[in-house]
């Protein structure tokens, strides 16, 4: 893909990550290597027809690192050109701690790799019928969920964007909402307390260990006024960390509100 800014690159990668996650092909964790992205970058003067000399940037372990590397390399190349120096076609390694890069090796052109056709591989012919069969079997994708959450559950667009922005959130939301029948309240608990605790514990959404059943029970307890909001949040921390049954816990600890 041909892109012109760090923002455009990150938007593309985030979209690609969601597609792959929803297909179940990978969890797409850059820091663990289940998703990789190298960046080839060049600059040219405004109005110039030809691209400048490109470099390839490696060791990019997060979307934030990719954005910083793009901005850093763009600035480095512009500085070289303005000083009358040449940009060397090379592979560079990004150091996110120092927010700078250093040369690894010279970057060859395609002909230098000496590519040639593999004689033992037969041509693969993909029919329109095969494509349609694959389409029919693929799971519901993020964009489809985004619309459905607003239409079926009556969620605001903001809620739907957050919940579908990670498949783990979407799966948790749908399962819990199906149990308690309170989609907006389930959404609120995921978007506030769940995300807060994930950040505090430096966890990713796919590391959530509590069950949808226990989240649904807590939503019911809070909605019925059986526990105060303060108690509900305290109990949820136990649910988040230990996946306890909130209903049994509040009864055992005498935390039910007396009307």
Give the predicted meaning of each segment.
Residues 1-259:
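Charged, compositionally biased, marginally structured helical/coil segments
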